[in-house]
Amino acid sequence: MGLWAELCISLRGLSFFLVLMTGEGTRGGSFKESLGVCSKQTLLVPLRYNESYSQPVYKPYLTLCAGRRICSTYRTTYRVAWREVRREVPQTHVVCCQGWKKPHPGALTCDAICSKPCLNGGVCTGPDRCECAPGWGGKHCHVDVDECRASLTLCSHGCLNTLGSFLCSCPHPLVLGLDGRTCAGGPPESPTSASILSVAVREADSEEERALRWEVAELRGRLEKLEQWATQAGAWVRAVLPMPPEELRPEQVAELWGRGDRIESLSDQVLLLEERLGACACEDNSLGPSLRG
């Protein structure tokens, strides 16, 4: 076997020896317990490898000594030689608990197994257990947490929930502070701009109120017609019910239920619009034109 082949074999054996001595996944050869490790075994593994060393070589030669005599002596030189080394080295082997696995076969740690991945930055910290990032919840970190409904007040005024977070808002003329949560006074406005804004707001409120009143009136008219029909239908039902139920035609039953659903829906719409109208207030706390007198 040539010198180059012996060198390759020795380097492979030495690298394997160093891996076993340092320990896979550890530093300084020390083993650190981790979560999910059920058992640990340290075995002595026989290892055979080649190592290099300096071999002395003695070369004799003749020289001239004192008295003109010829003397025999030698000089020492060194060359790189190889020798086979056998020794037993400790090797640690771990067994993972149920619900845990090794990241690779030679690892000394175990990672948790989650049947479904942890979403939105979540981390699998135990068997089918996710540790979610702030703003997310649920078993797999797939549910957005509504911070605005939390018991802890996050915003001094308005709060808008977003995916994984929230935003704070401020009413006019306040502005959001540097902390992004509290409101502070904004820059002073000129009287002209303030008066223009006030007029625009009053005009917008007036137009919205007229539109709401027209919509309420229209819905009330439709509701009155349906109530009249319901009265007539009630009399028809009372006249029909004494007959056996199997004699009722399916289209009559379907029409009766459909009209009833429309009446209920219109009643809800009218109630909602009346509540919105009741929330309107004049600037000087006076009654509107329709409520005076």
From Swiss-Prot:
<dbReference type="InterPro" id="IPR000152">
    <property type="entry name" value="EGF-type_Asp/Asn_hydroxyl_site"/>
</dbReference>
<keyword id="KW-0106">Calcium</keyword>
<keyword id="KW-0325">Glycoprotein</keyword>
<feature type="disulfide bond">
    <location>
        <begin position="170"/>
        <end position="183"/>
    </location>
</feature>
<dbReference type="InterPro" id="IPR050969">
    <property type="entry name" value="Dev_Signal_Modulators"/>
</dbReference>
<feature type="disulfide bond">
    <location>
        <begin position="65"/>
        <end position="71"/>
    </location>
</feature>
<feature type="disulfide bond">
    <location>
        <begin position="38"/>
        <end position="97"/>
    </location>
</feature>
<dbReference type="InterPro" id="IPR001881">
    <property type="entry name" value="EGF-like_Ca-bd_dom"/>
</dbReference>
<feature type="glycosylation site" description="N-linked (GlcNAc...) asparagine">
    <location>
        <position position="50"/>
    </location>
</feature>
<feature type="disulfide bond">
    <location>
        <begin position="96"/>
        <end position="110"/>
    </location>
</feature>
<keyword id="KW-0732">Signal</keyword>
<feature type="disulfide bond">
    <location>
        <begin position="132"/>
        <end position="141"/>
    </location>
</feature>
<keyword id="KW-1015">Disulfide bond</keyword>
<dbReference type="GO" id="GO:0005509">
    <property type="term" value="F:calcium ion binding"/>
</dbReference>
<keyword id="KW-0677">Repeat</keyword>
<dbReference type="GO" id="GO:0005576">
    <property type="term" value="C:extracellular region"/>
</dbReference>
<dbReference type="InterPro" id="IPR000742">
    <property type="entry name" value="EGF-like_dom"/>
</dbReference>
<keyword id="KW-0175">Coiled coil</keyword>
<dbReference type="InterPro" id="IPR009030">
    <property type="entry name" value="Growth_fac_rcpt_cys_sf"/>
</dbReference>
<dbReference type="Pfam" id="PF07546">
    <property type="entry name" value="EMI"/>
</dbReference>
<feature type="disulfide bond">
    <location>
        <begin position="114"/>
        <end position="124"/>
    </location>
</feature>
<feature type="domain" description="EGF-like 2; calcium-binding">
    <location>
        <begin position="144"/>
        <end position="184"/>
    </location>
</feature>
<feature type="coiled-coil region">
    <location>
        <begin position="206"/>
        <end position="235"/>
    </location>
</feature>
<dbReference type="InterPro" id="IPR018097">
    <property type="entry name" value="EGF_Ca-bd_CS"/>
</dbReference>
<keyword id="KW-0245">EGF-like domain</keyword>
<dbReference type="InterPro" id="IPR049883">
    <property type="entry name" value="NOTCH1_EGF-like"/>
</dbReference>
<feature type="domain" description="EGF-like 1">
    <location>
        <begin position="111"/>
        <end position="142"/>
    </location>
</feature>
<protein>
    <recommendedName>
        <fullName>Epidermal growth factor-like protein 8</fullName>
    </recommendedName>
</protein>
<feature type="disulfide bond">
    <location>
        <begin position="148"/>
        <end position="159"/>
    </location>
</feature>
<keyword id="KW-0964">Secreted</keyword>
<feature type="signal peptide">
    <location>
        <begin position="1"/>
        <end position="28"/>
    </location>
</feature>
<feature type="domain" description="EMI">
    <location>
        <begin position="34"/>
        <end position="112"/>
    </location>
</feature>
<dbReference type="InterPro" id="IPR011489">
    <property type="entry name" value="EMI_domain"/>
</dbReference>
<feature type="disulfide bond">
    <location>
        <begin position="155"/>
        <end position="168"/>
    </location>
</feature>
<feature type="disulfide bond">
    <location>
        <begin position="118"/>
        <end position="130"/>
    </location>
</feature>
<dbReference type="Pfam" id="PF07645">
    <property type="entry name" value="EGF_CA"/>
</dbReference>
